[in-house]
């Protein structure tokens, strides 16, 4: 079930639980976080807040459904600190899966008009790859990574800097190999990190 964070309500989750019991199937809820920067969320017209994502994730966690979070790694208004915080936020919540993708500029949208006028400066694929590597390094190791680069439909003006999706994917994997980075290799901020550092001194 793919939906928005501000559309999660206990009554809907009860329906899903009943369906799960009736049909004996696993249920995954997909939520778009996209960014932890409130100014960016306004820019792209998400009309939900980070707090609403947290609330929705906690509600879903109470029902023990799988939860897949979506993050856009190359939003022009986000910096690497925002991207790192997105990975951390996902990791402290009951998120079981993640999809990472780049910004799609769809024809006929407000973003498309801004792009065509030159009001948006998109990040190059190399920066997208750097941000994905950062996310993966900060991500909790047990979260299933379903996607690290997306493919777009024909009505898309721009995605992945015009590069083929597989080329971007291979570049990300190359960066991780060359730098000896694995998922969760920098996930050292959970479970009282400051106390652990003090105890180990």
Across the structure, where does each feature detected by a protein language model lie?
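Surface-exposed cleft-lining segments at the edges of enzyme active sites
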Residues: 39-46, 72-75, 119
